[in-house]
A protein has these predicted regions:
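Buried hydrophobic packing segments
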Residues: 21, 25, 198, 290-301, ...
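Short acidic loop-to-helix transition motifs that present clustered carboxylates
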Residues: 111, 213-220
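Glycine-rich phosphate/diphosphate-binding loop of Rossmann-like nucleotide-binding domains
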Residues: 6-23, 27-29, 147-216, 228
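Glycine-rich phosphate/pyrophosphate-binding loop and the adjoining helix
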Residues: 135-181, 185-187, 205, 310, ...
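N-terminal glycine-rich phosphate/adenylate-binding segment common to multiple enzyme folds
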Residues: 49-154, 237
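Buried hydrophobic positions in well-ordered alpha/beta secondary-structure cores of metabolic enzymes
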Residues: 11-14, 67, 131, 168, ...
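Glycine-rich phosphate/nucleotide-binding loop
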Residues: 45-48, 107, 114, 222-323
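N-terminal beta-loop-helix "entrance" segment that forms/cooperates
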Residues: 33-57, 222
Length: 345
């Protein structure tokens, strides 16, 4: 059965790295017989240019009907300060598709260890996943600003907490089988609920170890002993901060993919970096995060584990061979990096 994939190239370097990702997917499909079709749609600044809105109605329609969605990058300086901005399209898409779980793998490639701000011995063996709740918590509660007082409401239901923690346990079941639930249980009522639910869900996964960590000590451990983590799960605010902290461990955003999942609809796969308008159109953007996002899609949405691993190993082999784009210390162009990965599939 043909899989329908929507490609949202977006802005800046987005079109260049999207092409790279799709070229790798096409090359892999020729080897493995993966049957798919691509529907390219405007989004972000490109959506504003095409239809006056960062998430055009037709783009949303095809996204709802898709099996998976690939997003490259959004954001353009021409919309800075504008009432309608490209980034609003991503927030709207997350809301419309109920993308409640953000998944961010953090893995340090041996050939790129020197880029990390941490000592090599600190990052040896780092390979963990941050699972962040994306649609609840303080970002989505009431925000009240008065003349001399302000308050923000942090609100979570049992069901919201349960589904994100269950997602983390499902991921851990196929990894090293350790879930670290991060909260502030010694202070916050929402964290007391969070810990209660985590304990309850853990009973359904007897082969997975559950650990609890307060967010402040977790932030410290992510720097002093990041290799201890397997799967981290946490609420929206803590996840926002910790996932950004984790992204600096590799020393570059150019090799880090992410996924956002809903309960029943299509998932969204994207690099964690921005649109880099300063280098757009020059053919020098690092396509690896986009290519690894394609690998995540194959594994998570389509269950094609071997295909995903082929891409990941090809990326690792290309880096080990010294084929590097400028952001990671080399001179390879976007095209050369992509071709090197395809040659090693």
């Amino acid at each position: 059965m043909t899989k329908k994939i929507v490609a949202l190239a977006g802005d800046g370097i987005g079109p260049e790295i999207m092409e790279a990702g799709l070229e790798v997917l096409e090359a892999l499909a020729k080897k493995t017989g993966f049957d798919y079709e691509i529907d390219r749609r405007p989004f972000g600044g490109a959506g504003i240019d095409a239809a006056g809105h960062p998430l055009p109605d037709e783009t949303l329609k095809v996204c709802r009907e898709a099996d998976a969605i690939l997003l490259a990058a959004i954001g353009s300086p021409q919309y800075d300060g504008a009432a309608v901005r490209p980034e609003q399209g991503l927030l709207a898409l997350r809301k419309e598709l109920n993308l409640y779980a953000n998944i961010r793998p953090v893995k340090i490639f041996d050939s790129l260890k020197h880029l990390s701000p941490l000592k090599p011995e600190r990052i040896a063996g780092v390979d963990f996943v941050v699972v962040r709740e994306l649609t609840g918590g303080i970002y989505f509660g009431d925000h009240i600003l008065e003349e001399r007082k302000a308050r923000d409401i942090n609100d979570y239901s049992y069901e919201e907490v349960e589904r994100i923690i269950r997602k983390a346990f499902e991921i851990a079941s196929n990894r090293r089988k350790i879930v670290t639930s991060i909260d502030k249980q010694n202070v916050l009522a929402t964290s007391k609920l969070w810990r209660k639910v985590a304990e309850k869900v853990s009973q359904d996964f007897p082969d997975v170890t559950l650990e609890h960590q307060l967010v402040d000590s977790a932030a410290m451990l992510m720097i002093t002993n990041p290799a201890k983590f397997d799967v981290i799960v946490t609420e929206n605010l803590f996840g926002d901060i910790l996932s950004d902290e984790s992204s600096v461990l590799s020393g570059t955003l150019g090799v880090m993919p992410s996924a956002s999942h809903s309960e029943n609809g299509p998932s969204l796969y994207e690099p964690i970096h921005g649109s880099a308008p300063d280098i757009a159109g020059q053919g020098i953007a690092n396509p690896i995060s986009m290519i690894l996002s394609v690998a995540m899609m194959l594994r998570d949405s389509f269950g094609r584990y071997e295909d995903a691993e082929r891409i990941e190993l090809a990326v690792e082999a290309s880096l080990a061979a010294g084929i590097l784009t400028r952001d990671i210390g080399g001179q390879a162009s976007t095209k050369e990096m992509t071709e090197a990965i395809i040659a090693r599939l």
